[in-house]
């Protein structure tokens, strides 16, 4: 099945705003790193500032297609470190971590909800919906400014389908399932293959996949060219070492025949 988000140009996905933004220190970090990431061709997913190891700044990013390789993390880290040193959004020492969104990733943009329709999600609302703030169910897609969710925690069919306004969502993320793991692996292989292709380091195709003109159907079914006769060029000379020649040579040695006769 074709991913509808794959049809959107990368520049539009890079410009797509996030639905959930961070407060406080994380917001200051976001204002510094988001333009740099966009200029490099990446999208900011989330920024988390924690007290781990004194202070840790975790920056979660991705390519427009949702993929992320270790080489991407290394490139982003090298680009952001000097920028953050100059901007100095944090007034103390900190540890910088660059990571991918992961399999059970947060959903922070409209395209995230569109891309992961059909998967199990957990949603926490900033504004209560029908007296509830937490929902869990199968994401059915997006309708206007809301996400469609089929809840799996209710027995009443009439209450299973809900529409949650995206602007009122505080946090939404995928739930780890076998189906999600399989989908993530498939996307990862495709992204890795495309990256290698862009870098020109794709391995050679297997022997049976090579385009061998001699084995192609067109070559096998083509009429064979007519061959010119080469009988004259390959005409054999009469042998000179037959039994008759050997007997004549012996008679010549004994003087029984004239040399001219023995030729």
Curated annotation (Swiss-Prot):
Residues 217-231 have a biased composition (Basic residues). It is found in: Cytoplasm. Coiled coil: none annotated. GO terms for biological process: ribosomal small subunit assembly; translation. Transmembrane segments: none annotated. Keywords: Cytoplasm, Ribosome biogenesis. GO terms for cellular component: cytosol. InterPro entries: Ribosome_maturation_RimP, RimP_C, RimP_C_sf, RimP_N, RimP_N_sf. Its main location: cytoplasm. Residues 232-257 have a biased composition (Basic and acidic residues). Required for maturation of 30S ribosomal subunits. Belongs to the RimP family. This is Ribosome maturation factor RimP. It comes from Nitrobacter hamburgensis (strain DSM 10229 / NCIMB 13809 / X14).
């Amino acid at each position: 099945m074709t991913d509808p988000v794959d049809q959107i140009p990368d520049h539009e996905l890079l410009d797509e705003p996030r639905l959930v933004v961070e407060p406080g220190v994380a917001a200051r970090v976001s204002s510094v790193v988001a333009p740099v990431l966009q200029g490099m061709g990446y999208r900011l997913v989330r920024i988390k500032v924690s007290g781990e190891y004194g202070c840790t700044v975790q920056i979660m990013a991705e390519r427009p297609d949702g993929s992320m390789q270790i080489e991407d993390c290394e490139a982003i880290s090298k680009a952001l470190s000097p920028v953050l040193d100059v901007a100095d959004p944090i007034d103390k020492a900190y540890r910088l971590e660059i990571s991918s969104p992961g399999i059970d990733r947060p959903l922070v943009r409209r395209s995230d909800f569109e891309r992961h329709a059909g998967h199990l999600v957990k949603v926490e609302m900033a504004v209560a919906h029908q007296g509830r703030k937490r929902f869990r169910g199968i994401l059915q897609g997006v309708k206007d400014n809301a996400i469609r969710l089929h809840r799996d925690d209710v027995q009443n069919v009439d209450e299973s389908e809900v529409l949650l306004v995206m602007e009122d969502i505080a946090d939404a993320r995928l739930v780890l399932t076998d189906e999600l793991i399989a989908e993530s692996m498939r996307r990862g292989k495709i992204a890795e293959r495309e990256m290698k292709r862009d870098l020109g380091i794709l391995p050679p195709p297997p022997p049976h996949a090579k385009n061998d003109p001699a084995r192609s159907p067109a070559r096998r079914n083509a009429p064979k060219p007519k061959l010119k006769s080469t009988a004259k060029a390959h005409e054999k000379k009469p042998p000179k070492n037959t039994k008759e020649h050997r007997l004549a040579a012996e008679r010549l040695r004994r003087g029984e025949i004239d040399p001219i006769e023995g030729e």
